[in-house]
Design a protein with these regions (language model features):
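ATP-dependent phospho-/nucleotidyl transfer catalytic cores
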Residues: 93-149, 258-263, 284
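Short alpha-helical "patches" and their helix-cap loops
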Residues: 75-83, 161-171, 290
Length: 290
């Protein structure tokens, strides 16, 4: 995959984007609108608590999600120079054609029969909102929700909240469809620095801790974050069965490893880390059900 220099691309100052981690600007590249995500500043932050790898996580996880059957944003890695040259993740703006993005938090607030606000991530409340909302077919939306959960489990996403998935609405026809999944920067242990990566590669206890202990889902049951491994083990023959049947057969670790090898800017130990981590997550989450 050829690296891209976005420095001289036309800036589009009329577009702005939400999100807490890192600066974001819009540029025109190859006749499309792209959102450039910059790595967060590490000033006055311990390395292990920064998200210095979030741009890599965003690109790798978004692309892998598409590879294994979840419709997700299209991303590219490149550089942008403004005094310093930084690696950035470019995300194709899927609202550039005029459609309006409504996140699930906004939709949740329209369900007047719900007793909780839009930001609540209690699983039963989220599922109730899926049934009661009137934007898209609830059956289709529930299938997408569980597909996204399975993919997030594989990728180790600890921040799939109600503000980073949702719907695209055509302002003229008022018709809605499910938006591509986006905001994958909290996948694949973005806080891991070089030392942690090497420890995870070389120490099974360090690796297992980052599979069985954390990260957990942002979804909750009775106020407690859902652990991915236990939840999938308990529900593989229940609510998760259709999504597991759709997603898991499409997870080709050899194909994913080839993609990682073809990704620019990564050091050899980073490539090794992502391969080891994904293989271990696959085994812990899915192999026992084969």
């Amino acid at each position: 995959m050829e690296p891209i220099d976005f420095t001289d691309c036309e800036r589009l100052p009329g577009r702005a984007y939400n999100g807490a981690n890192g600066k974001k600007i819009a540029v025109r590249y190859d006749d499309d609108v792209w959102l450039l995500k910059f790595p967060p500043s590490t000033a006055e932050k311990p390395t292990t608590l920064s998200y210095s790898n979030s741009c890599y996580s965003e690109h790798l996880a978004s692309t892998i999600a598409n590879m294994i059957g979840l419709k997700a944003q299209e991303t590219r890695l490149g550089t942008f120079t403004n005094g310093k040259t930084k690696v950035v993740c470019a995300c194709r703006d899927f609202t550039a054609d005029g459609k309006v993005l409504y996140d699930f938090c906004s939709i949740k607030n329209t369900v007047i029969d719900s007793d909780t606000g839009g930001t609540g991530t209690e699983l039963n409340d989220v599922l109730e909102t899926i049934e009661l909302q009137s934007f898209v077919d609830p059956v289709e939306l529930k299938a997408h929700f569980w597909d996204m959960f399975v993919v997030d489990a594989f990728l180790g996403n600890f921040d799939r909240h109600n503000g980073n998935w949702g719907f695209l609405v055509d302002p003229t026809t008022r018709k809605a469809k499910i938006a591509p999944a986006f905001d994958f920067g909290s996948c694949l242990l973005p806080q891991a620095d070089d030392d942690i990566m090497r420890r995870v590669i070389g120490d099974k206890a360090e690796l297992d801790a980052r599979i069985y202990n954390f990260p957990a889902s942002a979804l909750k049951q009775e106020g407690k974050k859902i652990g991915y491994v236990d939840f999938i083990a308990q529900n593989r023959d229940g609510v998760l069965a259709p999504s597991l049947a759709r997603i898991v057969p499409r997870i080709d670790l050899a194909q994913i490893n080839a993609f990682i090898d073809d990704t620019p800017y990564l050091a050899d130990h980073q490539r090794r880390f992502y391969k080891v981590y994904l293989a271990a997550r696959f085994s812990a989450l899915f192999a026992s059900g084969e």
